[in-house]
Amino acid sequence: MALKNLEHIGIAVKSLQISDPLFEALIGCPPYKRESVVSENVITSFFQSGETKVELLEATSPESAIAKFIEKRGEGIHHIAFAVDDIKAEMQRLKQSGFTLLNSEPKKGADNKLVCFLHPKSTNG
């Protein structure tokens, strides 16, 4: 088992109202999707150019992981997401390899996809 491909890059932003036009100019197309992920207290905008996807994440609560990330580090790259065939098997493989998982079970993220986050200290992040 292995990671299949880069699924997207997640970027924490203070305001989608400000960041969406910036990334539209940068990438050359508007976001193809905006979605509220209530469980994570974020609103996301997705951009795509070819096979490359960028997810912008704006916090909807000061308690969200994105709000805390921005408070501590400022806006910027929050995560790199990889596609996998079997998320539970991949979580087990990563755990056995010494990575610290932030959730013990997959949870729903944007696009209703199952996700699992690794602790940044496990990945030099």
Predicted regions and their residues:
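Conserved active-site tyrosine of GNAT-family acetyltransferases
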Residues: 19-24, 47, 94
